[in-house]
């Protein structure tokens, strides 16, 4: 699995977690593996778990930098992608910042709109 595919998998887990905050990332992964629609990838699991564990800090950064936007007004797709990018930028040292931003923007173009991609790039 490529890094981009792993990020996409992590994004899916982070996005799904936004609908089910009571379920742990580990439980979500286990259910997905049992249903056979997810092959686990070590990097994807690391990203999803770290984003979940560090969500309060990540969300605080989003709120401080999304000028004119409250977190609850940001779409779940954009919020999940921002969480993914900030997780990589802050907690995964091997990934350059510009790569994290670019990957989140590219995923936004795939799962959201050009406007969402521009918003993510701006934050």
Role assignments for model-derived ranges:
Residues 1-123:
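N-terminal interaction/assembly modules
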């Amino acid at each position: 699995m490529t890094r981009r595919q792993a990020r996409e998998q992590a994004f899916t887990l982070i996005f799904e977690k936004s609908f089910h905050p009571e379920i742990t990332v580990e439980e979500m992964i286990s259910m997905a593996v049992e249903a056979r629609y997810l092959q686990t990838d070590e990097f994807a699991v690391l990203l999803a778990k770290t984003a979940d564990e560090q969500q309060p800090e990540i969300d605080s950064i989003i709120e401080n930098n999304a000028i004119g936007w409250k977190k609850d007004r940001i779409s779940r797709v954009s919020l999940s992608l921002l969480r993914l990018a900030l997780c990589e930028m802050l907690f995964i040292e091997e990934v350059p910042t510009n790569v994290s931003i670019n990957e989140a923007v590219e995923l936004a173009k795939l799962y959201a709109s050009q406007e969402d991609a521009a918003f993510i790039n701006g934050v």
